[in-house]
């Protein structure tokens, strides 16, 4: 074998070796994942933590439910009718994840891998009037479901594995270095590989941070969703108005008391002129 052939062979071996170590590194990173859902006081909420090199790099708390339409035969066995399966993310799910500087991913599997949820987060920088600003967002959701699973699907036609994907998704947009929090329900539509079917993903009680976690197992400052901020304002506004009204009443009473006291101390001038002779 000539020198050129040996060099090519050596280069191929080096590439294979690098690919092997890269795959091993990813595998090790994915193994550093914890399901802490048992710590949640909300039985519907799951808690997932991804750690790399002994440090938390992704934290996610949320409750998830999927509304999945599927076809069944009508009673005449000629027509098809559409039913809906409601699939909730359950505790004890298997979880994998990976963290990157600009891209992080969370994968969750449950019911013997009949269901798989994949969430992809990206961090981006944008030029604004204030300068360069970085944000992160949920850029892709994929839900794989098996309609032959009998717990949620009853006699589904063409039962089997289907994949539902988001389309041009930009959700949970949050300034970099902050966590996203939203107690209100949020819906994301997913186009299914099952023809003409749209899966609806419902998220609630969300608290997520896929980048820039400073303290282990601790979320950074929260960026609240607009719905939560509006609800918080609606809750505090009556209290603020009540305090203002109470303050106005107190001020009015004080002014009345001062005025009444000043009036009482003034010399009373008799209206009847005949009384002047008794004065002095």
UniProtKB/Swiss-Prot annotation:
Domain of life (superkingdom): Eukaryota
PTM (free text): Glycosylated.
GO biological process: establishment of protein localization to organelle; presynaptic modulation of chemical synaptic transmission
Alphabetic keyword roster: Cell membrane, Cell projection, Cytoplasmic vesicle, Endosome, Glycoprotein, Membrane, Signal, Synapse, Transmembrane, Transmembrane helix
Keyword Nucleus: no
Membrane topology, from the record: Single-pass type I membrane protein
Subcellular localization: Cytoplasmic vesicle membrane; Cell membrane; Cell projection, Dendrite; Cytoplasmic vesicle, Secretory vesicle, Synaptic vesicle membrane
Positions annotated with a glycan in the UniProt record: 35, 53, 102, 127
InterPro entries, alphabetized: Lamp2-like_luminal, Lysosome-assoc_membr_glycop
Keyword Transmembrane attached: yes
Extracellular face of the membrane: 30-235
Cellular component terms (Gene Ontology): cytoplasmic vesicle membrane; dendrite membrane; early endosome membrane; endoplasmic reticulum-Golgi intermediate compartment membrane; endosome membrane; GABA-ergic synapse; growth cone membrane; late endosome
Gene3D superfamilies in alphabetical order: 2.40.160.110
Regions that span the bilayer: 236-256
Signal peptide extent: 1-29
Cytoplasmic face of the membrane: 257-280
Family, as annotated: Belongs to the LAMP family.
Function: Plays a role in short-term synaptic plasticity in a subset of GABAergic neurons in the brain.
Annotated protein name in UniProt: Lysosome-associated membrane glycoprotein 5
Organism annotation: Rattus norvegicus
Taxonomy of the source species: Eukaryota, Metazoa, Chordata, Craniata, Vertebrata
């Amino acid at each position: 074998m000539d020198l050129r052939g040996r060099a090519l062979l050596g280069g191929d071996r080096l590439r294979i070796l690098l690919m092997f170590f890269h795959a091993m590194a990813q595998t090790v990173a994915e193994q550093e994942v914890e399901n802490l859902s048992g710590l949640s006081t909300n039985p519907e909420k799951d808690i997932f933590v991804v750690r790399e090199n002994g440090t938390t790099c992704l934290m996610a708390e949320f409750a998830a439910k999927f509304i999945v339409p599927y076809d069944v035969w009508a009673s005449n066995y000629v027509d098809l009718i559409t039913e809906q399966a409601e699939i909730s993310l359950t505790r004890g799910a298997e979880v994998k994840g990976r963290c990157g500087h600009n891209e992080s991913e969370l994968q969750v599997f449950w019911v013997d891998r009949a269901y798989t949820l994949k969430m992809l987060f990206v961090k981006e920088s944008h030029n604004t009037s204030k300068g360069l600003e970085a944000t992160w967002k949920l850029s892709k959701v994929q839900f794989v479901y098996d309609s032959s699973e009998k717990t949620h699907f009853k006699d589904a036609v063409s039962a089997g594995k289907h994949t539902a994907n988001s389309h041009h998704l930009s959700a949970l947009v949050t300034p970099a270095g902050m966590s996203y929090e939203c107690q209100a329900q949020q819906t994301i539509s997913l186009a299914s590989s099952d023809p003409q079917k749209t899966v609806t993903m419902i998220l609630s009680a969300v608290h997520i941070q896929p980048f820039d976690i400073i303290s282990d197992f601790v979320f950074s400052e929260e960026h609240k969703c607009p719905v939560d901020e509006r609800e918080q304002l609606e809750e505090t506004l009556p209290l603020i108005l009540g305090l203002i009204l109470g303050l106005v009443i107190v001020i009015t009473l004080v002014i009345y008391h001062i005025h009444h006291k000043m009036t009482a101390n003034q010399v009373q001038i008799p209206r009847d002129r005949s009384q002047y002779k008794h004065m002095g």
